[in-house]
């Protein structure tokens, strides 16, 4: 038998295939490892920033509780409830039948406040402590801290401390944001360099991309990592036209936690549905892939709805109707294969999508009588018209709910993020228009770059959200980083017409400029040094714990009430979680203490709510000549014009505090006035 030549075609082909497969596996492993590494670096970075800002390691546990301001304290209080309960199940039972948060009402806080992060962390904390104890691990180290004029306190550090376990969980989840941005950069650029470019942009604009390092317990801290992770998986699915049960499972594994952890997730997913709709209507997503995506959203919604005990806001928000609208469009699209004129096709689908989404949204809200999300549309309405009420003022007078600040745009331009993203965006749009038949469609052909178009449209949606409400720049800035990675996409930037040397040189030059402009931002973040201390509030809480009954009911401004509940465990009537029509009505009644209503009328309101004590801060009655509508006096003149000519109750409280004469405010009585900051009125 004749021997085959050494360099036979079969052997060369086998060798080539093996080499290609090995290269592919090595490349994939490199991408995964680098992604995990940047995630770990991000975790360490946010942890360091948090410690630098608060000097958290040297605080006593009660000081750590006070450091969780406003709604952060409210969320942490439920974690504290579960870990201090006799058993995990009893703790969950306590928070699902809560009578402390809104005195006079029993509420299911899991349904109302998206508390699954606290439930999960509390569930993990108990067995972790037990296992560490059995293994003789030292997981907590305690010492006494001298606080100068204040009494010494015991401070405990280590993963065994409930606070450390909690914030470590937050920062581990938050660290994955950098990983997802790196993977997205690789996906849209077809290059590891694109991944590096996107994650460098994120690092150098970190202060404009997230606030987890300052406010760990907020819902966005837990949910956004899953939202951006979901976007990464969705981009992969669209890019490689994947479909089937495994992809549904992957997408659902990210979408469900995101929905459970943050009420705003459904609005973020609504923008995603809109972005997918546009890509699908331009024939950039195949039918099978579109079905996979919409099925994952339907399953995620149903699981989220059930685990949140039938959260009413999920039914009436735009997300649920948009899922049904896109699902219908996907399934009727084969019937429209003969409609070849693309503008007519897209317009027809857009009319169907908008009609079903808005029709169902309005119909469900009216039919079920649910107004929980009405304040969102009131806020948007107030931004473009003269409309305003007490509730919209509480939002829009806060900087984070105002329009995006010019300084933010200036910073993002200064680090070259916006210029780089704009160059990438314009280049993509130019190539897309050039290579896509926008007039006539061939339903049998699926276009390329659907994953890029999806992310570009998602960026546009995120930018609109950020410009309207500054707090939402956490969606815009990361997506600017993702789109900036297109600069490393060789197919978009010149292709074979530009030599590899020139492309690499341009990329290296851009990265060098990014380092030059971005490193000072990182240094500035790391140079933030602080130490949390609030002796006035500490004195107040000591007084409450030693001078009031355990079942004494408190009212006051929303931020303070969250900390009163967390630290003193006293029942409260109002709190900072404002996304429910009932609590908005309660808060309006409580804040009548800052109005110009007759004092007897306000006393009656407090009595009817069962309030025993009202916590008042002198700064609550301050004036602002620049924005008089943004102080409580101005808000109440707008809300209650018939009493605008009367003496403000604020003036009476201040006068009584200064003169120590309770007769001026009878039947109220000042029972605490120790530090000219906090005043407690007995009802």
From Swiss-Prot:
Example of a GO MF term: mannosyltransferase activity
GO biological process: carbohydrate metabolic process; cell differentiation; nervous system development; protein C-linked glycosylation via 2'-alpha-mannosyl-L-tryptophan
Outcome of swapping residue 185 to D: In dpy-19(e1295); randomize the neuroblast QL and QR asymmetrical pattern of mab-5 expression. Abolishes C-mannosyltransferase activity in vitro
Disulfide links within the chain: none
Subcellular location: Endoplasmic reticulum membrane
Tissues in which the protein is found: Expressed faintly in neuroblasts QL and QR, more strongly in the neighboring epidermal cells (dorsal hyp7 cells, ventral P cells and lateral V cells), and in dorsal and ventral body muscle cells.
Pfam families the UniProt entry points to: Dpy19
Listed InterPro entries: Dpy-19/Dpy-19-like (IPR018732), Dpy19 (IPR047462), Glyco_hydro/deAcase_b/a-brl (IPR011330)
Key word Phosphoprotein present: no
GO cellular component: cytoplasm; endoplasmic reticulum membrane; perinuclear region of cytoplasm
Topology in membrane: Multi-pass membrane protein
SUPFAM superfamilies registered for this protein in UniProt: Glycoside hydrolase/deacetylase (SSF88713)
Enzymatic class: transferase
Annotated function: C-mannosyltransferase that mediates C-mannosylation of tryptophan residues on target proteins such as unc-5 and mig-21. Mediates the attachment of alpha-mannose in C-C linkage to the C2 of the indole ring of tryptophan. C-mannosylation takes place in the endoplasmic reticulum and frequently found in thrombospondin (TSP) type-1 repeats and in the WSXWS motif of type I cytokine receptors.
Protein name: C-mannosyltransferase dpy-19
Gene designation per UniProt: dpy-19
